[in-house]
UniProtKB/Swiss-Prot annotation:
Residues spanning the membrane: none
Start and end residues of each stretch annotated as Disordered: 334-367
HAMAP family for the chain: DNA_mis_repair
Gene Ontology MF annotations: ATP binding; ATP hydrolysis activity; ATP-dependent DNA damage sensor activity; mismatched DNA binding
Biased composition (Basic and acidic residues): 357-367
The UniProt record lists the keyword NAD: no
Reported function: This protein is involved in the repair of mismatches in DNA. It is required for dam-dependent methyl-directed DNA mismatch repair. May act as a 'molecular matchmaker', a protein that promotes the formation of a stable complex between two or more DNA-binding proteins in an ATP-dependent manner without itself being part of a final effector complex.
Coiled-coil regions, chain positions: none
Record's protein name: DNA mismatch repair protein MutL
Assigned GO CC terms: mismatch repair complex
CDD domains attached to this UniProt entry: HATPase_MutL-MLH-PMS-like, MutL_Trans
Length: 628
């Protein structure tokens, strides 16, 4: 066994960097926190090539003297705390004194700083942990730190960095969080010479959200304020029904620090259980405050996670506060929802269309909120919900088309043939699928509007209508994408979309791909876009929500950028969910047609997400269940 020895400061700093500096965004985080702790009211962040080649953070904070600038590069040197008890009354973002020496050990690190009362500033240059020079420089009060060639001295770490685009998205997200945490501080963010956002000092959180996320997002929020037993919950939360496809706009702060808190996140999700659709996440920018001694911010190397001393109490408080606010919103709405005798809707004459393009005797909508008329036998059961309030569309020829009747497919969309598709010879062996519906399949009934029950000579078949439709649509769209023949409908009134800077950058990088697959999306100013055409299978009302969900998939990394075929498959998977429109009333012929279409696909056993489309209960299984 080798002898025990004390590591050099350079090696120790590089090891610490592995814990604290995991990617370029972590560098930006540490430098922005230092700027805020220095009392800065203006912070500018600039980076290039995802932070690999350059990151620069400049502030107008208090600055440092020459001695402090050199001491800040020593391990565990900090001005934030002086004893362990200070952790129980922590009022700063940083406190360990590890960040600057760790960053300097794995990069080319240049620091320029000047404190008030000094005639000249100080410049310190460190390369790979080695001090190159210390000299005077001219600069205004404040600090500028430039980090270049990150991880050049540690190639093993550099090769694990993601693409420039991914690393840039993390940096933008980081700066955005601290801009939200401190609305009174002006923030600028520049990527490769392009301004991502520039937000002046904002008097309110709502104005900062409008600057960063867009006015549309800000208008979807309502304030929340609750105080109880030394805990305070403030900020802005989404109105009932307003949800997002990802958690990127469910942001929590603990004592002004942006954190990932399972306790707070799950409390928000539980509070909105009945207020947002299933599979969606609430929109929230909430600030939780408590005694610093009641929360531990020292449980994670990068201080991303916190631990509460009494987590059940915190969770209950947040749930009660949010539910109470949502009830207040609902009660306020109900005050305006009561129609008077003067403005009650007048009865229509028989056969006359009712308001919103529906007839009085139309069947009630399914739980999905869509009424429909089934297709004739032999056609796939899909519906549309175009009404008088829907946006009309233009065919490619330019002629205005009326609203599609419920259940009618656009004529340009080819139907899947009834004949089964061949299975690849080299495919892995799978259980033989059931035979398509035949006269021996006796339709029993439809349960809960979605599950079709068939009786066969072998037992019972329970078919999930939605899952079956998704599989059929998935393979239909895949075929369209492969052939390049994607019919689209041009909108008479383009749909305006305002995005946050990250989403806008992601969309710009992929807009050409989307335009080749049925969309027409055009940039219309900074972070503004117009959807001018959508695929024929999509209703115009779904265009903006679908685009936002798609951008959420981009941001989560669920999008293969380098493989066009995989990208088309992912687009078809997301689109198949939106394309399905379940009619409220379905007959036996329509269900048999659906089964025929399902077994004409390559993988009829599951939907695109891998869930089963049907369940077979044979006689043996039924006997076992009934203990015969």
């Amino acid at each position: 066994m080798a002898k025990v020895r004390i590591l050099s400061d350079r090696v120790a700093n590089q090891i610490a960097a592995g814990e604290v500096i995991e990617r370029p965004a972590a560098v930006v985080k540490e430098l922005v926190e230092n700027a805020l702790d220095a009392g800065a009211t203006r912070i500018e962040v600039e980076f290039r090539h995802g932070g690999r080649s350059l990151m620069r953070v400049e502030d107008n904070g208090s600055g440092m003297s020459r001695d402090d600038a050199l001491l800040a590069l020593e391990r565990h040197a900090t001005s934030k705390i002086s004893e362990a008890a200070d952790l129980d009354r922590l009022g700063s973002y940083g406190f360990r004194g590890e960040a600057l020496p760790s960053i300097a050990s794995v990069s080319r690190f240049e620091l320029q700083t000047r404190e008030a009362g000094q005639n000249v500033g100080t410049e310190v240059l460190v390369s790979g942990g080695k001090l190159v020079h210390v000299r005077d420089c001219g600069r205004p009060v404040g600090t500028r730190i430039e980090v270049a060639q990150l991880f050049n001295s540690v190639p093993a770490r550099r090769k694990f960095l993601k693409s420039d685009q991914t690393e840039a998205a993390h940096i933008v997200q980081c700066v955005r969080l601290y801009a939200l945490a401190c609305p009174g501080t002006a923030f600028s963010l520049i990527e490769d010479g392009r301004v991502i956002f520039r937000s002046p000092e904002c008097p309110t959180l709502a104005e900062r959200i409008a600057e960063i996320f867009g006015r549309q997002t800000a208008e979807s929020l309502v304030p929340i304020e609750s105080v109880e037993s030394g805990m305070r919950l403030g900020g802005l939360i989404g109105r009932p029904g307003v949800g997002r496809g990802t958690r990127h706009e469910m942001i929590v702060f603990v004592n002004q620090r942006p954190v990932d808190s399972r306790t707070l996140n799950y409390a928000l999700i539980e509070s909105y259980y009945e207020s947002v659709p299933k599979g969606r996440y609430p929109l929230a920018f909430v600030f939780f405050e408590c005694d610093p001694a009641a929360v531990d911010v020292n449980v994670h190397p990068a201080k991303r996670e916190v631990r509460f001393r009494n987590e059940p109490a915190v969770r209950s408080f947040v749930i009660r506060s949010v539910l109470q606010r949502l009830r207040e919103i609902a009660d306020h709405r109900s005050d305006f929802a009561q129609p008077s005798a003067d403005n009650m809707p007048k009865p229509e004459s028989p056969g006359a269309p009712a308001a919103h393009g529906r007839k009085d005797d139309a069947p009630a909508a399914h739980a999905e909120g869509r009424a429909a008329t089934p297709l004739a036998a032999g056609n796939l059961i899909v519906t549309a919900r175009f009404g008088a309030e829907s946006t009309p569309y233009l065919e490619k020829s330019g002629a205005i088309a009326g609203a599609r009747p419920a259940g009618v497919l656009p004529p340009a969309v080819p139907r899947i043939p009834a004949a089964p598709m061949p299975v690849n010879a080299g495919a892995a062996a799978v259980p033989a699928p059931l035979k398509p519906a035949s006269p021996s399949w006796r339709f029993v009934g439809l349960a809960h509007g979605n599950y079709a029950l068939f009786e066969t000579t072998a037992g019972l078949i329970l078919l999930d209508r939605r899952a079956a439709h998704e599989r059929v649509w998935f393979e239909r769209l895949q075929e369209q994408f492969r052939s390049g023949a994607v019919p689209s409908q041009r909108l008479l009134l383009p749909v305006p979309v305002e995005l946050d800077p990250i989403a806008a950058a992601l969309l710009l990088d992929r807009v050409q791909f989307l335009n080749a697959h049925g969309f027409e999306i055009a940039e219309f100013g900074r972070n503004f876009f117009r959807i001018e055409a959508v695929p024929a299978w999509m209703e115009p009302a779904d265009a903006e929500p679908f685009l936002r969900d798609l951008l959420g998939a981009f941001r989560e990394g669920h999008w293969p950028d380098r493989d066009a075929n995989l990208a088309r498959e992912e687009l078809a998977r997301l689109a198949s969910v939106k394309a399905v429109r379940l009619p409220a009333v379905t007959g036996e012929q329509e269900l048999r047609a659906l089964v025929t279409h399902l077994f004409a696909t390559r993988t009829p056993m599951t939907n695109p997400a891998g869930r089963p489309t049907y369940i077979e209960l044979n006689h043996a299984e039924l006997a076992r269940r009934f203990q015969k």
